[in-house]
Amino acid sequence: MLQSQPIRRKLVVVGDGACGKTSLLSVFTLGYFPTEYVPTVFENYVSDCRVDGKSVQLALWDTAGQEEYERLRPMSYAKAHIILVGFAIDSPDSLENVSTKWIEEINTLCPNVPFILVGMKADLRSDPVAIEEMRRRNQNFVKSQQAELVAQRIGARKYMECSSLTGDGVDDVFEAATRAALTVRDSENDKSSTKCCIIS
């Protein structure tokens, strides 16, 4: 019996610079946590997954969160099936930017593509050094309940948390993302992706 071809899906990860996007993808695809921060311009990975008995080839697109790459980033949205919108648990500003920047960009470029809100660096809530740093900056970690409310308000499929450092929740994020991507038909996606190719 011939093996059927895997279903191909494209996942794009967006969010502020240094919020943990590249680490998340590295841990999921390569199995290691990068120890040095190097700003991403564009990185692509491919992962073969099995979800609900279906073989899925997931193309993973990492994007730059920094402002200097804003003219390039829209290209990465073309033909996306699912978007992960990331923020760092230790950066309330990065969650604020989800509502004020990232969702606006997604709704403009890919209005029909589902997205999941992902709180990254969840391990820092119990890290003594991080706790002290947040106290020194007079800031609080983002609470799960806060992020849940944001997810509901912006129309995210769901809210999830993970830690790339410990690996907690990483596989769950990609399993949920793959499931959501499988609900998108390519014909719908092609209509919305025409907007994704416009560069001004």
UniProtKB/Swiss-Prot annotation:
Subcellular location(s) of the protein: Cell membrane
Alphabetical UniProt keywords: Cell membrane, GTP-binding, Lipoprotein, Membrane, Methylation, Nucleotide-binding, Prenylation
InterPro entries, A to Z: P-loop_NTPase (IPR027417), Small_GTP-bd (IPR005225), Small_GTPase (IPR001806), Small_GTPase_Rho (IPR003578)
Motif (Effector region): 37-45
Binding-site residues, GTP: 15-22, 62-66, 120-123
Membrane topology, from the record: Lipid-anchor
Lipidation (S-geranylgeranyl cysteine): C197
Top-level taxon of origin: Eukaryota
List of residues that carry Cysteine methyl ester: C197
One Gene Ontology term, aspect cellular component: nucleus
GO molecular function, a single term: GTP binding
Stored SUPFAM superfamilies: P-loop containing nucleoside triphosphate hydrolases (SSF52540)
One record GO biological process: signal transduction
Keyword Cell membrane: yes
Subunit structure: Interacts with pck2.
Summary of the function given for this chain in its UniProt record: Involved in cell morphogenesis, the maintenance of growth direction, control of polarity and of cell wall integrity. Regulates the synthesis of alpha-D-glucan through activation of pck2.
Sequence similarity: Belongs to the small GTPase superfamily. Rho family.
NCBIfam families linked to this entry: small_GTP (TIGR00231)
Protein name listed in UniProt: GTP-binding protein rho2
Species of provenance: Schizosaccharomyces pombe (strain 972 / ATCC 24843)
